[in-house]
Amino acid sequence: MELHAITDDSKPVEELARIIITIQNEVDFIHIRERSKSAADILKLLDLIFEGGIDKRKLVMNGRVDIALFSTIHRVQLPSGSFSPKQIRARFPHLHIGRSVHSLEEAVQAEKEDADYVLFGHVFETDCKKGLEGRGVSLLSDIKQRISIPVIAIGGMTPDRLRDVKQAGADGIAVMSGIFSSAEPLEAARRYSRKLKEMRYEKAL
């Protein structure tokens, strides 16, 4: 299972850059999801993390296809309701395109529109969406049975829930507050990374 870390749009550029650089070796992908920041601020963030040695192949630009193209980042995440994957692929066929979905119908539609994968959530109740009940691992399982592209699960992901998500068929997990709201982001990322490695080891036995 892949481990995706998603920025939470709550930190100044310099602090966020330090966290990203610190956790880069513990995660598979880092999604830049800074919706309140200007293009100039996001470009400054990218400059800082490139200087810090981040592997550009690990970066996913959420929503800002323009910045991805300008910065030669080849992975983009399209929010629900934005451009369709098919529209983006027609113009920029080199991009690897994810689509955020919240239902079985949206997941099926994303596959039809040529998304490379879907980000489904929120699976469990989460601090990011307080008061909203999670959509559950049962729906996650239903989606996996209906589509053939990878499904990344997001929402309320904690290390002790990863087995349930794996059993439902998820190809990876995405974590926002569990890492970026932690007082110790590196140790938080390591807890997820260790749990995933432990699960892979058990499967190999």
Swiss-Prot record:
Disruption phenotype: Inactivation of this gene causes a delay in sporulation, but does not affect cell growth and the production of extracellular enzymes. The active site is at H122 (proton acceptor). It is an enzyme of class 5 (isomerase). Substrate binds at H102, G156, M176, S177. Pathway: Cofactor biosynthesis; thiamine diphosphate biosynthesis. GO terms for cellular component: cytoplasm. GO terms for biological process: thiamine biosynthetic process; thiamine diphosphate biosynthetic process. It catalyses: 2-[(2R,5Z)-2-carboxy-4-methylthiazol-5(2H)-ylidene]ethyl phosphate = 2-(2-carboxy-4-methylthiazol-5-yl)ethyl phosphate. SUPFAM superfamilies: Thiamin phosphate synthase (SSF51391). The keyword Isomerase applies. Catalyzes the irreversible aromatization of 2-((2R,5Z)-2-carboxy-4-methylthiazol-5(2H)-ylidene)ethyl phosphate (cThz*-P) to 2-(2-carboxy-4-methylthiazol-5-yl)ethyl phosphate (cThz-P), a step in the biosynthesis of the thiazole phosphate moiety of thiamine. Cannot use cThz* as substrate, indicating that the phosphate group is essential. Has no thiamine phosphate synthase activity, despite a high sequence similarity with ThiE. Homodimer. This is Thiazole tautomerase. It comes from Bacillus subtilis (strain 168). The gene is tenI.
